[in-house]
């Protein structure tokens, strides 16, 4: 048996759990907090008002794009002089990543690049992060349970991670009601990101029995729930996708990812496309590459299981499942990576950059530059 361990925060998952935000804040002991939030929708504003009634809010930061180094530096300059004992993040993956990065870097003593992977030294944080509470409003990235924050570095055209086990939130509050009535295109992109983050750890060279037990349960359920949500809004399917998202976050944090996420960082930095849409456009092509190059008998069985789950959710024959998935995603409105802004001339650059990605290190097979280029060309 492979060695197994899980690093996870305290997780509370329940429809309506955010109605208890005040008691949770008192339990944690926050007195002066920064709120990091996305677009202030009614549900988000309701939570913010509840927070304001029980603690002092020193700043509110609104996040509308994936965190970038220049924006992060601006917020750090403003916050380092404030007396803060907690942070609360309410939003999607970009919001949670911004809060996570700020929680770690506000107490840090050195330059930001000291702690960044790939473009920096990748050193551990020299001080404990500010405790924070994660309240995701989308079911996608799983950032509420991961120990890294993804930061865009425009000058390097790379997205890299700030990574430290202490970046996990003090508690993650998973309230599926916050995702109700999410627009279809957001549901699709976030949902396929979440499913990818369950599938890639299932095939990862770092997979463990613990993460296997988690993702095997939710991949088939997630595929059916996401398919349903493209035509019908139901609370039960929203609840399922919230579970898929948090499960994918736990799995990737403990077993790694693979080729789809290996591409996602460089491709996103080059094109500016949303992370979930990139994962959606690449998932079927990444799976085809695994089927073509994986020889490990155990992984071959797992790939066949994925084909079966896809056929159950989407119809068709298991042997055609990856093509069926690709066609279904396109029919739902996410076309190839060319539609996201990638040109054929940029493909070699993205392929080469992806090879140094932390996500690619867990891919079940080593893929050389020529193969990576071919995958991207087929995904155009």
Where are these regions (language model features)?
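ATP/NTP phosphate-donor binding region
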Residues: 1-86
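Glycine/threonine-rich beta-strand-loop-alpha-helix active-site module
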Residues: 70-177
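Glycine-rich phosphate/pyrophosphate-binding beta-alpha loops
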Residues: 140, 246-279, 357-361
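Carboxylate- and glycine-rich phosphate/diphosphate-binding segment that chelates Mg2+/Mn2+
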Residues: 148-255
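Flexible, glycine/charged-enriched surface loops at secondary-structure junctions
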Residues: 205-214, 229-240, 255-260, 297, ...
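Gly/Pro-rich interdomain helix-loop hinge
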Residues: 270-346
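Short, amphipathic C-terminal "tail helix"
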Residues: 344-380
């Amino acid at each position: 048996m492979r060695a197994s361990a899980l690093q996870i925060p305290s997780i509370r998952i329940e429809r309506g759990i955010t109605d208890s935000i005040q008691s949770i804040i008192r339990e944690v002991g926050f007195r002066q907090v920064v709120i990091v939030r996305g677009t202030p929708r009614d549900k988000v504003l309701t939570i913010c008002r509840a927070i304001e009634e029980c603690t002092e809010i020193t700043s509110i930061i609104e996040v509308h794009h994936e965190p970038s180094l220049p924006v992060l530096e601006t917020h750090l300059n403003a916050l380092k002089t404030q007396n803060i004992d907690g942070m609360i993040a309410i939003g999607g993956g970009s919001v949670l990543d911004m809060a996570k990065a700020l929680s770690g870097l506000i107490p840090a003593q050195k330059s930001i690049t000291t702690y960044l992977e790939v473009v920096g030294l990748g050193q551990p944080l020299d001080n404990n992060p500010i405790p924070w509470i994660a309240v995701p409003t989308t079911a996608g990235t799983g950032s509420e349970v991961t120990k890294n924050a993804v930061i865009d570095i425009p000058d390097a055209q790379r997205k890299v991670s700030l990574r430290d086990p202490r970046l996990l939130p003090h508690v993650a509050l998973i309230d599926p009601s916050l995702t109700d009535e999410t627009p279809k295109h957001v549901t699709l992109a976030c949902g396929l990101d979440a499913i990818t983050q369950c599938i890639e750890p299932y095939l990862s060279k770092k997979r463990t029995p613990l993460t296997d037990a988690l993702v095997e349960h939710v991949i088939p359920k997630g595929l059916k729930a996401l398919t349903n949500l493209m035509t019908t809004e139901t609370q039960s399917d929203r609840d399922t996708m919230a579970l898929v998202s948090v499960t994918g976050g736990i799995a990737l944090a403990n077993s790694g990812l693979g080729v789809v996420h290996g591409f996602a960082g460089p491709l996103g930095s080059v094109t500016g496309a949303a992370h979930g849409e990139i994962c959606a456009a690449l998932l079927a092509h990444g799976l085809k590459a695994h089927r073509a190059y994986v020889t490990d008998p155990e992984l071959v069985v797992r790939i066949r299981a994925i084909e079966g789950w896809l056929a159950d959710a989407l119809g068709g024959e298991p042997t055609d499942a990856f093509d069926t998935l690709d066609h279904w995603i396109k029919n739902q409105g996410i076309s190839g990576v060319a539609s996201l802004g990638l040109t054929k001339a940029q493909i070699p650059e993205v392929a080469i950059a992806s090879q140094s990605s932390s996500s690619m290190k867990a891919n079940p097979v080593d893929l050389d530059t020529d193969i990576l280029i071919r995958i991207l060309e087929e995904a155009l």
